[in-house]
UniProtKB/Swiss-Prot annotation:
Keyword Nucleotide-binding applies: yes
Residues that, per the record, bind GTP: 10-17, 63-67, 123-126
Main localization category: other
GO molecular function, one term: GTPase activity
An annotated GO cellular component: cilium
Gene responsible for this protein: IFT22
InterPro entries per the UniProt record, alphabetical: P-loop_NTPase (IPR027417)
Its biological purpose: Small GTPase-like component of the intraflagellar transport (IFT) complex B.
Cellular compartment(s): Cell projection, Cilium
Keywords: Cell projection, Cilium, GTP-binding, Nucleotide-binding
Name of this chain's protein: Intraflagellar transport protein 22 homolog
Quaternary state and interactors: Component of the IFT complex B, at least composed of IFT20, IFT22, IFT25, IFT27, IFT46, IFT52, TRAF3IP1/IFT54, IFT57, IFT74, IFT80, IFT81, and IFT88. Interacts with IFT88. Interacts with CFAP61.
Amino acid sequence: MLKAKILFVGPCESGKTVLANFLTESSDITEYNPTQGVRILEFENPHVTSNNKGTGCEFELWDCGGDPKFESCWPALMKDSHGVVIVFNADIPSHLKEIETWYSCFVQQQFLQNTQCLLIAHHKPGSGSDKDNPALAPPLNKLKLVHSNLEDDPEEIRMEFIKYLRSIINSVSESRDREEMSIIT
């Protein structure tokens, strides 16, 4: 069975925990409580299987606290990660600048490909869902950007996340196949 580790990162109060719970079908949290360090959610998704082998896949979703005081822990969180989801609150202008730092630390410095990264512009309930694409600085503007609004269209973000999980599993599977071939030859 293939396993993949995916990090949920981004600024404080961007909606990472709410999205993580929704996408992994974990418990609902009704009041805001900042994540201290990291929460690890383990789950399987029946819609995601390994490359034409039909074998199941296990995921670890690491819901990382957005407070900069945890920056010293980031190297440990990043170790052996296969993908990074950067979540930001689309209604807070300062988040656009902050996600550049998250991208630099968690994607560029880890030498992950842009295909291993997903950018989610999260809209909190009652905020209205302005689907206009925010003005993202390069290289963020090359990433896949998805809007999420759990109030208006929860299934859209679920379907986009499943597509993302499939691409991560394909990447993990191809990497494993290359490794096995290098051992054989």
